[in-house]
Amino acid sequence: MLSGQTVVSIQPVVGSPLDKTEFIVAMAVAAEQAGAKALRIEGVENVRHVSQATNVPIIGIVKRDLQDSPVRITPFVCDVDALATAGATIIAFDATDRQRPESRETIANAIKNSGCFAMADCSCFADGQWAAQIGVDIIGSTLSGYVGEIEPTEPDLELVKQFSSAGFFTMAEGRYNTPQLAAKAIENGAVAVTVGSAITRMEVVTHWFNSATQAVRQNNESISY
């Protein structure tokens, strides 16, 4: 069902006027009508309402900011249980080998026991290899570039290629902000591509356009003098 398809991640900028459940549901319905074959939704209540309004699989996550761990994505079994009850089809979790309140094995097993499919949000090939070995269903490149190093501007197509070559069900995710980059992910073996900011974060996209137009203006002004 997801082969060659686009998954839309709907996670508005925190504190944005669009960061309200009713707007998230509206964007989810619009994305489904436009052809999205799955949705990635953060927050239990958001998952609950989106699942009632749409008919495509939902990748559910809970994001937390913990004082004693850098892990943010679905760090607790209670998050898994709540997402499953709310209507998630797939539950994604941070699969990186970092300090965390509950082990990644514990989280993966909880997802399996919930009856949902599991998706590993990975930062490198070792993360994906670990996840595949314990039976995680979907291996994502979600966290490549987000685990301490300087954040790149381009997506990690090489990691997508490595996952695909290893036979993993590969979800390309992270910095796929143009249709051309999404197509390259499929060319490199991704089963599907998740796109977020370029579709659902108005503030981010507006900043991209402003930066581009202002750079030209500044360059022209410097030349004129």
Swiss-Prot record:
What's a single GO MF annotation on this record? N-acylglucosamine-6-phosphate 2-epimerase activity
- Domain of life where this protein originates: Bacteria
> What is its pathway?
Amino-sugar metabolism; N-acetylneuraminate degradation; D-fructose 6-phosphate from N-acetylneuraminate: step 3/5
- The cysteines joined by S-S bonds are none
Against CDD domains, the record matches this protein to:
NanE (cd04729)
Q: What is the lineage of its organism?
A: Bacteria, Pseudomonadati, Pseudomonadota, Gammaproteobacteria, Vibrionales
The protein in question is named Putative N-acetylmannosamine-6-phosphate 2-epimerase
Gene3D superfamilies registered for this protein in UniProt: Aldolase class I
